[in-house]
Amino acid sequence: VNAGCAAVVPGPGATEADEALCLRLMESFGRAIVIPERLMDAASATAGSSPAFVFMFIEALADGAVAAGMPRAQAYEFAAAAVAGSAQLVLETGRHPGDLKDMVCSPGGTTIEGVRALEEGAFRASVMNAISACVEKAKAL
């Protein structure tokens, strides 16, 4: 869908022209970011493995909506659109995701209750642990 993000690690003999060419080629598939080689495992885990985690999140959002009575097809559409729109907002604004989250959470509202429930379930720690597991597996390969 041309919406991925590729890591580019120029070799020691690469010129600026080589790097620019590589970036142009990789950007034909989405975004491309130049990183030092030591960050390749983290980039691979974040860009390469995370789609599976996002799919699981979309599925869980939809399952919650189905449990509340929404037909599954509509639930998937709502969930996927919410995730896509949220990601686009982070990319377009450059704002910290936590700031954007705070903007959506009304005091005493439904969203902050959902955030609290996610925190009780160690949502962020679970996601961070998944990335760490991917990085460790990549290092072992």
Where are these regions (language model features)?
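Aromatic-residue-lined binding/catalytic grooves and analogous aromatic/hydrophobic interfacial grooves
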Residues: 50
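Short pre-catalytic strand/loop immediately N-terminal to key active-site residues, enriched for Gly-Thr
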Residues: 39-45, 97-102
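Solvent-exposed alpha-helices and their adjacent loops that cap or buttress functional pockets
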Residues: 1, 24-27, 46, 93-94, ...
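NAD(P)-dependent Rossmann-like dehydrogenase/reductase catalytic/cofactor-binding core
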Residues: 80-141
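A short acidic, helix-capping loop that chelates divalent metal ions and anchors anionic groups
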Residues: 1-5, 43-44, 113
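Internal alpha-helical scaffold of NAD(P)-dependent oxidoreductase catalytic cores
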Residues: 5-42, 55-92, 137, 141
